[in-house]
Amino acid sequence: MPIDVRREIAQRALDLVGVPYKLGGRCPLAGLDCIGVVALALAGHIMPDEVPRDYTLRGEYLDRISAFFDRALFQNLGRESMESGDLLLCQTAPRQLHMAILTDCGVVHAHAGLRRVVLTPLPLPWPLVGRWRVLGE
């Protein structure tokens, strides 16, 4: 994928830092959850409404999320080096998954406990269970 596309995704994520947290949120004014952050950062590559909405905070949606991002528009990454703009799926608890976007400054994600979108430095405190990159145009 061209570097400028990866930078655009990372910058869109960084622009959301400070936005309020809201479970299921897709609007920065009302609030975003982790998947809402990913949907808005990918604007221009996917329609935000395409991203799955029927999940719960502690739901088992790994298969649904993986199937969505494994489609043709995304490259499923194995153990390759991580790059700014990569989409990360982490397991924050035994049955709790969480999405984030890698940037050169750290990882952007919606933090339910802090009630806002935050930038967290690496390394992440959670194991990665999935990683995708938007394919180039």
What are these language model-derived features?
Residues 1-32:
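N-terminal intrinsically disordered, low-complexity, charge/repeat-rich segments that act as generic
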Residues 2-10, 50-121, 137:
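...with weaker cross-activation on analogous glycine-rich loops/strands in unrelated enzymes
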Residues 18, 42-47:
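Short helix-capping and hinge/turn segments at secondary-structure transitions, especially at repeat
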Residues 18-22, 112, 136:
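A broad detector of the eukaryotic-type serine/threonine protein kinase catalytic domain
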Residues 21, 73-78, 128-130:
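Short secondary-structure junctions
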Residues 26-44:
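Active-site nucleophilic cysteine motif
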Residues 122-137:
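Glycine- and charge-enriched low-complexity intrinsically disordered segments
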